[in-house]
Amino acid sequence: SRFIHLSTDFVFDEKINEDAGLLYTEEDIPAPVNYYGYTKWKGEEKVAETCSSYAIVRVAIVYGRALPGQHGNIVQLVMNRLKAGQEIRVVSDQWRTPTYVGDVSDGVQRLIAHPTNGIFHICGVECMSIAEIAYQVADYMGLDHSLIHPVTTEEMNETTPRPRFSGMSIDKAR
């Protein structure tokens, strides 16, 4: 049997130069900025250390239709707020490579049959800010852009630190 471990882009610390168009690869050294990222990184290490057949799958901002009982995702949050005529604040200085849940499913299915152990990034090809994601949702759904308010990470004042940039390359998974 093969062990598939789902991980996250939050294992990274934003130190790569996004201005140069660089995305994190599977070979980049994790340096998480929060406890969630730290526990995922340590989980990756334990899987690699103890499993003889494994794949570590890093995903970022997974979106798609949520099943009953599941929490929503960025697409549903933006869509629901805008449809209700509610304003939404979104960060404009955090960049991710959002991932469609169907692509995660397809990638995991392929990795189950793949003989090589290792880390694989399964995410979208486009790196964009959270605000850009919100605007794309509004465009796709024909909803009001004026309700979207881009703010900086500092202005959002979240209690848990998040990496400003955690865009991942999917070259290895291709």
Task: Please describe what each predicted stretch is.
Residues 46-96, 103:
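NAD(P)-dependent short-chain dehydrogenase/reductase
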Residues 8, 59, 153:
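Active-site loop/turn elements of alpha/beta-hydrolase fold enzymes
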Residues 71-76, 101, 130-134, 166, ...:
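A general structural signal for well-ordered alpha-helical segments in protein cores
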Residues 105-107, 114-165:
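Mid/C-terminal beta-alpha module of Rossmann-like enzyme folds, strongest
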Residues 34, 96-99, 128, 168:
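Residue-level signal for the nucleotide or nucleotide-sugar donor/cofactor binding architecture
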